[in-house]
A protein has these predicted regions:
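N-terminal binding-site loop/beta-alpha segment at the start of enzyme catalytic domains
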Residues: 1-110
């Protein structure tokens, strides 16, 4: 299991990996979210609520999550009840894949 959480240093590192998005104001520090004001977060996130609880949807979710993370989205929304916990597992699989390939670090992503 991958451990860790988003940090100010990590999210700034992620933001700086996308200079065109950074310069366009895509990354922001949320002013009204307790505990998140030091994080650099993408202006859009990826939600994981809908979809069938099956292997085909799991594969599509994992690929979509990895694509989003490679494209400048570092905010992922999930909960234990989304797709019977499968969405959380798909996020974990995508994160593990990208961390293992050294494409990103866990501290760059807000889940």
């Amino acid at each position: 299991m991958l451990t860790g959480f988003a940090t100010s240093t990590g999210t700034a590192r992620y933001r700086d990996r996308f200079p065109e998005l950074r310069d366009a104001g895509h990354f922001r520090r949320p002013a009204n979210v307790p505990g998140a004001g030091e994080l650099w977060l993408s202006s859009i996130g990826l939600g994981t609520y809908l979809g069938d609880a099956d292997a085909a949807t799991d594969t599509a979710y994992t690929e979509s999550i990895a694509s989003a993370l490679r494209s400048g989205i570092n905010v992922l929304d999930t909960a234990i009840n989304y797709r019977h916990q499968r969405s959380e597992r798909n996020i974990g699989a995508a994160l593990q894949q990208l961390v293992a390939s050294r494409e990103l670090n866990r501290d760059e992503i807000l889940v």
